Amino acid sequence: MYNEDSIVNLLKEKSATKQIVYSKTKDVFNKLVLALNKKEKSIASVLKDQVKNVELEFKSNGEFDAQLKFAGDTLLFHMHSNIFDFPPNHHILNSKYVKEDNLRSFCGVINIYNFLSDSLKYNRLNDEGFLIGRIFINKEDNFFVEGDKELDFLFNDFANQKINDELLDQIINVCMVYTLNFDLYTPNFNDVRLVSVHHLLAMSMNQKIKTSKRLGYKLSHENK
């Protein structure tokens, strides 16, 4: 049977750890917001005398969201307010680093989404964005990134990699290059051949036929 001591011990151990992880993740997100703002200014200063029609815009949307718009794409960075552990079959739990201290597996999460800028501009509620990566941060500032292509292997040394300003800048760069190379494909004809009157009227008002970069897209880790 459980007693109050077991409850107190769990509160001291897990709850305290989660509070530390939340604080660490919030600090990282605040640094990420500053890095995104700096990135927008840096690229804009280079482009201003070379390309006139490439729009760049940084926007902070409250405590947990930040956007970086460049040309036709927008990266949305969202910090989740909860702290997570990993499912039993996740490879992180098999690492020596986590086995030495199982509380190291508790992580805060910053999700990275790619949306078409016009989807947000025109409030096209049917449009879809894509989760391209997730940054996991633990109580010791160790981190790894889970995502697609480069995002899945460039930042995966959880045991030895601590988050810092330089690595945040690199993550932003990789996300931007990945997004710019992830082009918009025209949908299959049969997927869009039927259009209701409702959709037609909505389209005439605000272009609300669903648009997304790909159909059937998955992160690389989902195919493992």
Which stretches of residues belong to each language-model region?
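Hydrophobic-cavity lipid-handling domains and compact docking modules
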Residues: E57-F143, G147-D148, D152-F153
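Glycine-rich, aromatic-bearing surface loops/beta-hairpins
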Residues: I132-K224
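N-terminal, Lys/Arg- and Ser/Thr-rich interaction peptides
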Residues: M1-K18
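Non-transmembrane, amphipathic alpha-helical segments
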Residues: T17-K24, V28, N160
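Residue-level signal for secondary-structure boundary elements
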Residues: Q19, K41-A44, K48-V51, T179-P187
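Short N-terminal edge-element motif at the start of the domain
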Residues: K24-Q67
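Residues that form generic nucleotide/phosphate-binding pockets
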Residues: L10, K14, A35, K39, ...
